[in-house]
Amino acid sequence: MSAAAVLAVVAAAVAALAAAASGYELTKNGTVITYDRRSLIIDGHREIFFSGSIHYPRSPPDTWPDLISKAKEGGLNVIESYVFWNGHEPEQGVYNFEGRYDLIKFFKLIQEKEMYAIVRIGPFVQAEWNHGGLPYWLREIPDIIFRTNNEPFKKYMKQFVTLIVNKLKEAKLFASQGGPIILAQIENEYQHLEVAFKEAGTKYINWAAKMAIATNTGVPWIMCKQTKAPGEVIPTCNGRHCGDTWPGPADKKKPLLWTENWTAQYRVFGDPPSQRSAEDIAFSVARFFSVGGTMANYYMYHGGTNFGRNGAAFVMPRYYDEAPLDEFGLYKEPKWGHLRDLHHALRHCKKALLWGNPSVQPLGKLYEARVFEMKEKNVCVAFLSNHNTKEDGTVTFRGQKYFVARRSISILADCKTVVFSTQHVNSQHNQRTFHFADQTVQDNVWEMYSEEKIPRYSKTSIRTQRPLEQYNQTKDKTDYLWYTTSFRLETDDLPYRKEVKPVLEVSSHGHAIVAFVNDAFVGCGHGTKINKAFTMEKAMDLKVGVNHVAILSSTLGLMDSGSYLEHRMAGVYTVTIRGLNTGTLDLTTNGWGHVVGLDGERRRVHSEQGMGAVAWKPGKDNQPLTWYRRRFDPPSGTDPVVIDLTPMGKGFLFVNGEGLGRYWVSYHHALGKPSQYLYHVPRSLLRPKGNTLMFFEEEGGKPDAIMILTVKRDNICTFMTEKNPAHVRWSWESKDSQPKAVAGAGAGAGGLKPTAVLSCPTKKTIQSVVFASYGNPLGICGNYTVGSCHAPRTKEVVEKACIGRKTCSLVVSSEVYGGDVHCPGTTGTLAVQAKCSKRPPRSAATAQ
């Protein structure tokens, strides 16, 4: 089949997939959502659901349509989101449903895209979100205890749940009203907390279920990680491998639903990079459907950014960047494409999955077949599983032999033909690159505003004998609290030898501190996500007479999980000085003054009005407790923008007055690098000219070395073997509930052939082939190498098929590239890396 013919088939198949992806059957007059053990039922019809979490406050509203469209293009038919109480009611009785918190707009966009929705109201959501979504003011309600049979908590929880349900009803967003919402969630992962509260926990969860049902949404309610969910509430699974770790609801009338399949591991400051492969995620989903599951949600499908102070304790601004759509909303391949292909394969099997008789057939040690079959209608699907993590294998199923890669599942959509293998990736790969934006260096002039004098005890208004707990003072309005005290030393107190210095020892409940003695910087200390409490010990110089200690304590968000959140603490609790001639001096009860927040925060220097009210000076390097600013024009084009803060220490970033999050590049993980140093600047924040980049730096750094970059995924790759099944999206179609080969798709002498397809981003074409090898190449996208077997003609063939095209197809076959099938070690693998870019203007191209 010619490349042009294959591309025509591809285009038709993609269009058909987009049209059919949602299986959307809601009506404007309202839809009845029920369920049985097999699935949710939409107006009497069973359905399978592929869902993805996209949290509306973690992405700018102008990006929502694109994110939802890409999710649908990826084969999803459901979008899932939490509701964030502290975002919607930051002050008691003061509500916010605008901008990134316009949840009505978000769910209406889902409806416009003809997709279903799941709303996870909570209102405790965890979600690596500040305080788990609970507003700080709730802590100050008398006698309150969160998430137990506590009347004050239940009162305010019911008020908020009712508020959200009523707003969604007013907008007619529940399926019973013709809207997209087919499920609603109450509470979140409560089962492990129920043990802590014992009988009160059981009473609370039963109350929560009854309260939710009484809101009369007309759709089922769910509880995640609550195996024995009360009454008609459906329990759901959260985890990486729910097909193996979760037996399903105890009530056999309820379906197997998976609300969180973690597409990566969320990261905190101090974490090294972590990944979860596309193959492992695909295996977990195929496994879940093979044991009777009919809804799987990817948490996250797009993580986005924890803007401002929204991240929970120690959680970085960058959230689930390894999701199928990365932090910037770009396709992360092959994860996005491999899961899209899985969804397409499972849709071929929908009738068998929803109505077939399930059975299990052992095929050998660590091998099995799980079958759903309607013999009378000749409808069948089989999942051939290899649970051996080290070895590939061959099994015999219904008289035919099948190769099954290690730890994989092959899907036989007619119980005969392999249409998908979780281990064999047919979708393209890509590599993300960052590019210096030349135009942003113009007028690279930094100015600074240093915090007013470091506070002294005598100038403070909040004074106590001992240091105060921090959260009770800052009330989640700021990360910062000053602790200061003064003490007198005599000559006999100080060490006689110059090489001996007193040591300042500060113990803190968390999270980090910067210490000053007599206005001189002494040092920093911090805890970790796991161990927030810490002790800092730093040598210092003291003098005869009065000495002043000032400690700036900072938090990195409130805790988002566990029992008794309302009692969690932060801040300094003991201070001593060791190494004096007269022994250890305990300053803990010396009398302490406190100052809430920074001078720059009170002056709002990050705002246009505030920055004009203070005197800015020429910027200098390595200045602690300093606000820095500069102007810049945005990079040209539409590529995402990031700021590289590698040369800085710890602080908070603003662009045009909007808080983009905490940074902490001085804190290195075990591999010797910061957990995050690139920070997303949404294009919607940028003006055509004269943007303000500002940050508060706690420790000191070199602002002149900060870079503004753009983000691309223009390096596209493929890595496929002849053992890959033919591409499910355009090689197969469903006809009479059975998969049929698309006429001629990829067909050759050996029948259907695996075919690699390379496709550039919008408005770009393949301009060069960086690498091409057929045989046994090695490596990953962006770093391929030729193996011991290599067909020399490979690059020539690929260039002829691909250069100048937006999309090209490459049949994976030794005949095409002149590969030596007898070469020892050959794996019949094609590896290609190509570079996409915009075509140069015709005049420029002619001149060259």
From Swiss-Prot:
Glycans are attached at N29, N261, N472, N783. InterPro entries: BetaGal_gal-bd (IPR048913), Galactose-bd-like_sf (IPR008979), GHD (IPR041392), Gly_Hdrlase_35_cat (IPR031330), Glyco_hydro_35_CS (IPR019801), Glycoside_Hdrlase_35 (IPR001944), Glycoside_hydrolase_SF (IPR017853), Lectin_gal-bd_dom (IPR000922). One of its GO terms (molecular function) is carbohydrate binding. It comes from the Eukaryota. It holds the Pfam family BetaGal_gal-bd. Its EC number is 3.2.1.23. The keyword Glycoprotein applies. One of its GO terms (cellular component) is plant-type cell wall. SUPFAM superfamilies: (Trans)glycosidases, Galactose-binding domain-like. It catalyses: Hydrolysis of terminal non-reducing beta-D-galactose residues in beta-D-galactosides. PROSITE patterns: GLYCOSYL_HYDROL_F35, SUEL_LECTIN. Keywords: Apoplast, Glycoprotein, Glycosidase, Hydrolase, Secreted, Signal. It is found in: Secreted, Extracellular space, Apoplast. It is an enzyme of class 3 (hydrolase). Its main location: secreted. The active site is at E189, E260. Residues 1-23 form the signal peptide. Gene3D superfamilies: 2.60.120.740, Galactose-binding domain-like (2.60.120.260), Glycosidases (3.20.20.80). Residues 750-837 form the SUEL-type lectin domain. One of its GO terms (biological process) is galactose catabolic process. Belongs to the glycosyl hydrolase 35 family. This is Beta-galactosidase 11. It comes from Oryza sativa subsp. japonica. The lineage of its organism: Eukaryota, Viridiplantae, Streptophyta, Embryophyta, Tracheophyta.
